[in-house]
């Protein structure tokens, strides 16, 4: 049960534990609680170059279009600010990935357009006119779980890693 999750408490220099369903016991009267209703998306895309090198692209924030709802509806092209894993193996050129979607093979391409500090502007294009970027992330993306969990993403994480209030796609971690 989700309400049985561990709740860490800090009071007067001491740390103790409880469970989430008892959170109201620890909140002062008149407190305001703000709930995050965004769903964590499958924002990690794993590509393999023809040389065998593996490149991970972690979509952080949409650039074109900038609105999450709009970028998920895009067909054929969108741009994101991304982190790139194993960047030294991706000097130039397009990365390509075959994605199986409703019995069809869609070719997803990624092109590194420019550096943005520690991240990169990546343009994604694909060859299927009715396939949305949300469809591609659902089919080919991996849910980004924190590295401190020391494990790969599991299928059950698609539900259990979300907050109980999550409705709108848009979080990446």
Regions found by a protein language model. Give the residues of each.
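A cross-family signal for N-terminal binding/gating loops and helix N-caps
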Residues: 1-173
